[in-house]
Swiss-Prot record:
Signal peptide: none
Family from the record: Belongs to the acyl carrier protein (ACP) family.
Protein name: Acyl carrier protein
GO molecular-function terms, A-Z: acyl binding; acyl carrier activity
Cysteine pairs bridged by disulfides in the record: none
Protein's GO biological process: lipid A biosynthetic process
NCBIfam families (UniProt xref): acyl_carrier, PRK00982.1-2, PRK00982.1-3, PRK00982.1-4, PRK00982.1-5
A Pfam family reported for this protein in Swiss-Prot or TrEMBL: PP-binding
CC per GO annotation: cytosol; membrane
Pathways involved: Lipid metabolism; fatty acid biosynthesis
Length: 79
């Protein structure tokens, strides 16, 4: 099974149409990867589906980088 990081990166690549090497932990979805508000909503929905969890809107707004998404998923899967 792939790591959480790998699964998150794969989703980001698929959702935003960016190259895998562009998807680093520090990469901002909006500033570095060119996501708009619709992209970020779709990204959160894809993460929810992949990891079978619910990310409340107020939490989703705080997830602005790849690493923040990974950390959020880890915290909620393990917690």
């Amino acid at each position: 099974m792939s790591s959480i990081e790998d699964r998150v990166k794969k989703i980001v690549v698929e959702q935003l149409g960016v190259k895998e090497e562009e998807v680093t932990g520090e990469a901002s979805f909006v500033d570095d990867l060119g996501a708009d508000s619709l992209d970020t909503v779709e990204l959160v929905m894809a993460l929810e589906e992949e990891f079978e969890c619910e990310i409340p809107d107020e939490e989703a707004e705080k997830i602005t980088t790849v690493q923040q998404a990974v950390d959020y998923i880890k915290k909620h899967l393990e917690g």
